[in-house]
């Protein structure tokens, strides 16, 4: 693995008439140069050398103090015209063309290699990313046929020096903000909406944790509406609950876009999700009782809450003591492992998994609430929270 990157940020074309240097061109809420630096830091690069022209050098040097106090950045060295620093470079370093943006997995792959190579597109044209040595003149990417690596189509790279390419580059970056565990409803309904909102919010100084708190407020509001016990409020509760499900993606998208992900943020998001569910179940229990005057529905709601808390204790207790994760997505990832798929219950659990994804049940519960059927929601939730502890306990016993 390499720990040094050389990023070429030198102006090659006629400067544009804008007030800011091109290296500070905003791209999904971050200046281009900062996006490069945070991207390489995320994959393990500890030191970055920026090669720039005279027009960019002064502006970049003015940022050094701020970057040095932000853990999202590597140690940064700036080299203007006439600077000779080749002698201090390690034997191998990551060489990047700063006028391009790259798919995160391309950088991960590059950082893990120790051999001399260059990434090329399907036409065998260099894309401006590879591993070099001080033996090569800076700005000249090593082209050795046996070490050309053709990138897959989904691994995007795009020149953003040209203004007409930036919108396309932003769309490509937004796609990487999705999660691999997204369900069908999330991919086709929730994410398109949340990404459209995130695209605008990233341009403001809004911390992801603030979005999480706002989402929690919506979740609690859905419970308050449901507890009113009228058809109109029950319908509003379902709509607000699903809206909270859509907004639940915003905090993570903004955090990933601005490299602000943290374990604290993950736990806050997790707690927000569960409090939203508790508020909604509680509201449904009260609202269903008011709508039907049925004590049976009331006690079914109480039993649902009991088993829901039991499920939380089991799942989060395991996360806190047996894993480094703070999200229930950990269990979704475990289901995909080859070891888990060998188990007898694996087909059933794999089949049921989409039903416990928030994007799907949030949509279904919204429809049921709009139809004035809160008791059906309670029955569905009760079935889920009774089955989950049984399957999870069985899984733990077999693991031990």
Describe each model-derived feature in a short phrase.
Residues 200, 220-224, 366-367:
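Alpha-helical transmembrane segments of multipass membrane proteins
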Residues 208-264:
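Membrane-embedded alpha-helical segments that form the functional core of polytopic membrane enzymes
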